[in-house]
Amino acid sequence: MANSNLPRRIIKETQRLLSEPAPGISASPSEENMRYFNVMILGPTQSPYEGGVFKLELFLPEEYPMAAPKVRFLTKIYHPNIDKLGRICLDILKDKWSPALQIRTVLLSIQALLSAPNPDDPLSENIAKHWKSNEAEAVETAKEWTRLYASGA
């Protein structure tokens, strides 16, 4: 770990992520930049994303922990709170961020969002409309996208 200029907090959080990974989540720092993490989240059971492996990138800005990490999905996903660029609509990544939160909390919250899509606070209007007008069909589309784009990522 080339961590010469990293704040202690980032080093400690990284060590904990590696030694005690959260169930269904792996996050490993890049060799070149310890503020950049390659993340994999398994689709939660009993969700439309079950069986999927979703790749994300997480970046800790210079201001971290005073500013939230930047996180986005690299794997295509059909979800009302995630747009086609992989950006995530999650309160703790925006106005509800607190320095008391950690990388682990953020990743667990994203995993929970996969279990409980919220079409009332959408990032993708079209998917949210689909979810609200015909949830069963939207869930089927999400399952199909999971099979197409997230199987064995």
From Swiss-Prot:
Tissue: Ubiquitously expressed at low level.
GO biological process assignments: protein ubiquitination
Gene3D superfamilies assigned: Ubiquitin Conjugating Enzyme
PROSITE patterns (UniProt xref): UBC_1 (PS00183), UBC_2 (PS50127)
UniProt-annotated catalytic positions: C89
UniProt xrefs under CDD domains: UBCc_UBE2N
Reactions catalysed according to its record: S-ubiquitinyl-[E1 ubiquitin-activating enzyme]-L-cysteine + [E2 ubiquitin-conjugating enzyme]-L-cysteine = [E1 ubiquitin-activating enzyme]-L-cysteine + S-ubiquitinyl-[E2 ubiquitin-conjugating enzyme]-L-cysteine
Pfam families: UQ_con
Listed pathway(s): Protein modification; protein ubiquitination
Entry keyword annotation includes Nucleotide-binding: yes
UBC core domain span: 5-151
EC number from the UniProt entry: 2.3.2.23
Broad class of enzyme this protein falls into: transferase
InterPro entries (UniProt xref): UBQ-conjugat_E2_core, UBQ-conjugating_AS, UBQ-conjugating_enzyme/RWD
One GO MF term attached to the UniProt entry: ubiquitin conjugating enzyme activity
Keywords, ordered alphabetically: ATP-binding, Nucleotide-binding, Transferase, Ubl conjugation pathway
The family this protein is said to belong to: Belongs to the ubiquitin-conjugating enzyme family.
Further information: Partly functionally redundant with UBC35.
Biological role: Catalyzes the synthesis of non-canonical poly-ubiquitin chains that are linked through 'Lys-63'. This type of poly-ubiquitination does not lead to protein degradation by the proteasome. Mediates transcriptional activation of target genes. Required for postreplication repair of UV-damaged DNA and for adapting root developmental programs to suboptimal availability of iron.
Protein name: Ubiquitin-conjugating enzyme E2 36
Gene: UBC36
